[in-house]
Amino acid sequence: MVSKVKIGIIGGSGLDDSQIIENRTERVVNTHFGIPSDVLIEGKIAGVDCVLLARHGRNHSIMPSNVNYRANIWALKTLGCTHVIVSTATGSLKEEIHPGDIVIPDNFIDRTTKRVQTFYDGNELLSGVCHIPMEPAFCNRTRDVLIETARGIGLGVHEKGTVVTIEGPRFSSKAESNLFRQWGADLVNMTLVPEVVLAKEAGLCYAAIAMATDYDCWREAGEDVNVADVLATFKKNVTKVTDLIINAIPKVAALDWSDTIEELGKTVNTSIMLPHSN
């Protein structure tokens, strides 16, 4: 039996416009883990069932540390999503990744300090402790669709990259930025973790479209990262992200995901250690 696809889209800075979805219906969802960042907007893109959620709220009022990542992911799961495709603004740590470039990340480094990274925290809904493996960190089949779609529409794309997620809301110091470069990271952002971890725990096929908006602050020449430039670059290039999402969604829906979803479910189930009596 072929699994029906429903795609959750989490929009970051500059990509929270519900107009990309047709036949929109707003859904207020309250989860066991609290209230999501905003209402969820259900509808269709290219005939495919989708749900759009603004990560920071539609008024961009929620700072990265205060996003209820668990509620966001669980709400998408509750509404029947099989996939989550997200956009994220990032700082480039590599000269060859220019502001305005698109990257499809394949790995991450976690430098957050305040965020709950599991649904299995002793609550009455989910028993046990989940030691979810994070290799691969992202759904490679979904990543492949995004990469192939980008090529097909003539959009230049970096086909992999490691993202360092920092706590924020401050930007990195120059010493931190250079340290991340020494670690081999390609990008720095504030939202990918714990989102990517929670999506895997929830058994969802998760992939990200990262846009480089700046060069962070590691370069000796050039302007250091600032909010105005980040927003201006994202606004100038956001159509690249929306075009990629709109064109990729029907390609995702055309594939049979039954085995992929089943394997994800098995990974979650075999990662849970249930309490036992001595």
Curated annotation (Swiss-Prot):
Swiss-Prot/TrEMBL keywords: Cytoplasm, Glycosyltransferase, Nucleus, Purine salvage, Transferase
Site feature location: Important for substrate specificity: 172, 227
Endoplasmic reticulum among keywords: no
Chief localization: cytoplasm
Gene Ontology MF term list: S-methyl-5-thioadenosine phosphorylase activity
Enzyme Commission designation: 2.4.2.28
Binding site for phosphate: 13, 55-56, 88-89, 191
GO biological-process terms attached to the record: L-methionine salvage from methylthioadenosine; purine ribonucleoside salvage
PROSITE patterns listed in its UniProt record: PNP_MTAP_2 (PS01240)
Class of enzymatic activity (EC top level): transferase
Binding, substrate: 190, 214-216
Pathway named in the protein's UniProt entry: Amino-acid biosynthesis; L-methionine biosynthesis via salvage pathway; S-methyl-5-thio-alpha-D-ribose 1-phosphate from S-methyl-5'-thioadenosine (phosphorylase route): step 1/1
Reactions catalysed according to its record: S-methyl-5'-thioadenosine + phosphate = 5-(methylsulfanyl)-alpha-D-ribose 1-phosphate + adenine
One CC-aspect GO term: nucleus
Top-level taxon of the source organism: Eukaryota
Subcellular location: Cytoplasm; Nucleus
Family: Belongs to the PNP/MTAP phosphorylase family. MTAP subfamily.
Function, as annotated: Catalyzes the reversible phosphorylation of S-methyl-5'-thioadenosine (MTA) to adenine and 5-methylthioribose-1-phosphate. Involved in the breakdown of MTA, a major by-product of polyamine biosynthesis. Responsible for the first step in the methionine salvage pathway after MTA has been generated from S-adenosylmethionine. Has broad substrate specificity with 6-aminopurine nucleosides as preferred substrates.
PANTHER family named among the record's database cross-references: S-METHYL-5'-THIOADENOSINE PHOSPHORYLASE (PTHR42679:SF2)
Assembly and interaction partners: Homotrimer.
Protein name: S-methyl-5'-thioadenosine phosphorylase
Source organism of this protein record: Anopheles gambiae (African malaria mosquito)
